[in-house]
Structure formats: structure tokens, C-alpha cells
Amino acid sequence: MASIEFGVALPSVRGVGEFARLAERLGYDYLTCGEHVMFHGPVSNSLIALSVAAGATEKIKLMSSIVLLPLYNPVMLAKQTAVLDVASDGRYHMGVGIGGEFPKEFEACGVPVKQRGSRSNEALELIRKLWTEKNVSFEGRYTRFSGVTLEPAPVQKPHPPIWVAGRKEPAMRRAATYGDGWLPYMYTPEMLRESLTKIDAFGREAGRDMSAFRPGLFIFTSVYPDRKEAEEVAARSLGKNYAQDFSKIAGRYVLYGSPEDCPGRWQADLQCPLNSSTIEKLPHPPKRFATRATSWSALERKSLRRGDVLALW
């Protein structure tokens, strides 16, 4: 069985350094952070938060999950992410998405929400050039320039990995064209399997070698002693975050249950083709997460190994 890496998302804009050190100490492979300019509640900025985390850690990989790509000037984003990769000694992974579920932030930033897909595609093409080439000229629909070299260049070669997030076919095509990995959210294992088949076909259609393409999955988790409590917390937390009723669908998209339940559910889910990276988001405050995570002994973690697979919550 191929190796699966696990990550955990920052749960708050506060205490970033402390949480990052905890995640690294517990052995997570990735620390991730999402962002919005504005949403239904306080939301971080991934590049700023991960910069703080970079200074507090040494080994854990740092992933934006996601950068809200169409709201950025792509030249500035290329610069900021290159510097973050250098500052973290080559640990940055750029997860990208196009947003659109909160149109007010597009209006506030002066970006037409209907252009978010085309802007993102152009930005990805441009950013890869600026990361890897010198004296770059670019003639796009939204950005034009000539003779630009960004220094320092990223540490990782050929460039920091690009993970494309989304749920629908345009995002799959974007991943197949520009991405190094696929990072959907609110997906079942079956949905992941179907999407990867499409992405592979789209990539081959575009003439890409897809053998190194990495499938991932952003999973919401809720771990409590009582399974019913875990389900209720999951529905309540997601409902608050997304201003929707999750009471009927939390069970479809959330890994919830007791510390004893969840490993078994993971073992079933690991039959899906998730052979590179999984990102988890825990709807627990940092202190509760620390208590739950540290209570799961090293022996219990080792018992979950199947080949190179390690399932953590």
C-alpha cells in the first residue's frame, strides 16, 4: 500500500506558533491553513499564519488550504510564496481554490466573481513561470509585463507543489492542467475515486505525464468519547462555519466518533486511492485537540500502520 501523509488545519487565528509546535511534536506531516477576506466568522490569512508557523517549527510541511487565488495579484502572490518557501527551508505547499461562495469578498476586492475561474487559470500559469524562470514576459487577459525576475527563487525544485482544491469538473480540469495534486473537500471516498479517474483522463488529454500526480482529501473530523456527541458537534461546527444546516449531511462528509471508532472507519476509507496526502480539519479548540491527540498513545498509533499507512485523527 502506498504511503499516506496526514495533516491538521490551524483551528484559530490565535496561538498559531503553539499549535504548530504541537502538530509537529505529534508527528503530523502537514500543517494547513485556509483563508477568506470575509466569511461567516473570523477567518485567517494562510500566508501570514503559515509564516508564523514556519518560524515556530523545523520539519512539518506548511500548506495553504487554500489560497483564494483570484483575489491576489499573481505577481505578488508568486513573490510572497517564493519567500515563504525560502524562509521555511522548502516546506511550503500552495493549495489553491477559486472561492465564490461568499461573493461579498469579491465585490470588496474589486474582482468580478464570474471571472474567478479564468483569473485563477491565468495566475497559475504565470506563477509557475515566475517561480522557475528569469526575465519572464507575460501577455495574459488580466496581467501583462516583460523582463521580470523574482528573487529569491523557491527552494523546492522545480517549484513548490501546487494542490488544486474544488469539487466540480472545472476544478478537476484545472488540477489536471496546472496542479501537482488534487485536494477536494466534502467528498466521500467514492467521489474521490471518480474525480481522480476524470483528472487522469483530462491530464493525458492535455499531454501530461500523470504518474507523479498526488491525490489528497480535506476531511472534517470530530472526535469525542460519545459518538452522538461527536456527530452533534460536527453538525453544529460546520453549520456555524458555513451558515447552513448540516444536521442531515454531517455523517456523509465528516469522520466522527470516539477515539475507538475512528480508526476502524479510517481503515475502511483507506481502500480509496488516497496514496499521497490527507488533510484533516478538527472542529475542536486547541486545548481540546491537544487533550484528544495526546491521549491516543504511541502504541495505538503504531497499531494503525498498514504498510506505509498511518491513520491519525
Residue ranges and their predicted role:
Residues A2-P11, P70-S137, Y185-M186, E190-E194:
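Flexible, glycine-rich active-site loops centered on histidine and acidic residues
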Residues F6-V8, L31-C33, L62-S64, Y92-V96, ...:
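Hydrophobic faces of well-ordered beta-strands that scaffold small-molecule active sites
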Residues I4-R14, V67-P74, H159-R167, K248-E260:
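Active-site mouth loops of central-metabolism enzymes
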Residues L124-I127, L192-I199, P285-L304:
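C-terminal helical cap(s) of enzyme catalytic domains, especially alpha/beta-barrels
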Residues M1-L10, G100-K104, T143-H159, R227-G251:
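N-terminal small/glycine-rich loop or linker at the start of catalytic domains
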Residues G27, A53, L84, I127, ...:
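Conserved, mostly hydrophobic/aromatic
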Residues S12-A23, Q80, G166-R174, S258-A268:
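Short, acidic/polar
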Residues M1-T57, K61, K157-P160, L282, ...:
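N-terminal beta1-alpha1-beta2 module of alpha/beta enzyme domains
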